[in-house]
């Protein structure tokens, strides 16, 4: 099932796409795509609905972030062996974890803002994992039972803030609009193998990233289990699982986003995003 949120920022409503691609309103069955509504059992109830009987939503609606109420936006660094190689970094012996501020989350097609003082704003297409029920000390074998579904995440990164300004990566990852999420939350039953998802990213029509989740160092089940040993994962938490090669900092010479650029990215079966880049006010 493809779940989404539509409407003006801060007032999005829950919806879904039917087989014909028509947007249907879900607000008569769930208040929002957050909290208990993301539990796999609740999602199964939604999947049993006759979508043709739901109200159709007319017009060209803005899509918001596909999940609401995200408490933790957890990112995994250097989790693709081919991406680690392009940056000259060693493959980590354990997952590298950092946090992205939830205030960075925006819709999949909202404008991407270059922050003040930025000279190295970079792109990263990533597979997002959305938690559906509380996970604490879970095994790898049972980890996917706690997943609601998957989405596209653009882990926008300011490399000077991230690397050159010392300390944790967080400040280079958390600028406003640096977390476009969606267009859809695709329930896990429609993603039989999260470790075999082609993904891509283009800047101004030029392909920059063309990879697959099959080159992840640590897979989805391992990451959910691993993280749950250190913190409880709550419904609506997002795990952004790393990026394949082709980021701007790995190019020779490096290449970064500038105002006027257009970024498009997507993952097979999970939809695509498109952002216009402009300077922050």
Spell out what each predicted region is:
Residues 1-95, 264, 281:
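N-terminal non-catalytic cap/leader segment that marks the start of a structured domain
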Residues 136-150:
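N-terminal accessory regions of nucleic-acid-interacting proteins
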């Amino acid at each position: 099932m493809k779940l989404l949120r539509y409407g003006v920022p801060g007032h999005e409503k829950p919806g879904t796409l039917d087989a014909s691609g028509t947007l249907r309103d879900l607000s008569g069955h769930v208040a929002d795509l957050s909290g208990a509504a993301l539990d796999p059992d609740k999602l199964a109830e939604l999947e049993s609905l006759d979508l043709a009987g739901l109200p159709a939503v007319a017009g060209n609606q803005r899509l918001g972030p596909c999940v609401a109420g995200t408490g933790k936006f957890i990112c995994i660094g250097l989790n693709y062996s081919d991406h680690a190689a392009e940056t000259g970094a060693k493959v980590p012996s354990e997952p590298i974890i950092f946090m992205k501020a939830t205030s960075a989350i925006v819709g999949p097609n909202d404008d991407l803002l270059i922050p003040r003082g930025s000279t190295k704003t970079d792109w990263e297409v990533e597979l997002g994992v959305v938690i559906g029920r509380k996970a604490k000390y879970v095994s790898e074998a049972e980890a996917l039972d706690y997943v609601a579904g998957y989405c596209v995440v653009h882990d926008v990164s300011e490399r000077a803030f991230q690397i050159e300004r010392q300390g944790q990566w967080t400040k280079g990852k958390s600028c406003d609009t640096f977390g476009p999420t969606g267009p859809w939350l695709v329930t896990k039953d429609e993603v039989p193998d999260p470790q075999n998802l082609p993904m891509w990213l283009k800047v101004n029509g030029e392909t920059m990233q063309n990879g697959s989740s099959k080159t992840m160092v640590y897979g989805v089940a391992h990451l959910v289990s691993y993280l749950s040993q250190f913190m409880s994962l709550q419904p609506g938490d997002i795990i952004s699982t790393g990026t394949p090669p082709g980021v701007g900092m790995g190019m020779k010479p490096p290449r970064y986003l500038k105002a006027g650029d257009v970024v498009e990215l997507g993952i097979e079966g999970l939809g695509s995003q498109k952002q216009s880049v402009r300077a922050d006010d």
